[in-house]
Amino acid sequence: MWVTSTVTPETAPNDAFVPDQDGISDKVLDRMGVTVTSTSPMMSFRNNFNTEMSMGIFWDGYVLEVSAPMISGGAFLDITDPHVGGSFVSGGYTGEIDSTAMNPLAGRMAWSGNSGGYIDTVINMGPNLAGQTVTLRFRMATDAAVAAPGVHIDNISITGASCP
């Protein structure tokens, strides 16, 4: 489960944290009701991750997804899906979750491995979300074995959108 943590936030007093557990899991952190007001919305955040990876193989990781009624009918798609139109400016996904892993994200690009501390991620959310009220979610998934410290996300900012 994602929790509010005060242990190692980038900025006080807290951040969002999810551990990388040693069992199959699929955990989400949603932000509902983001109204996109621009044709060039941008999202930025700081993230610090240490997820299971061994010998260059990514076993656990997390992604950013969006649900937009006029694009996906409410289904969640990756922020980089062509229908969404988003792209990373910096700090994008680091590897593909192994396709043989018993991980709900198997075969998908994700943030995985060890970031070595907080890094900046900047995303051009693309023009396709303009005029829609969307739900954004971070989705962390793990395979059946080996725990790691987990994921911290802090300082989320979205321009070209309003959040109630």
Predicted features, each with a name:
Residues 1-164:
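Beta-sandwich/jellyroll recognition modules and their flexible linkers
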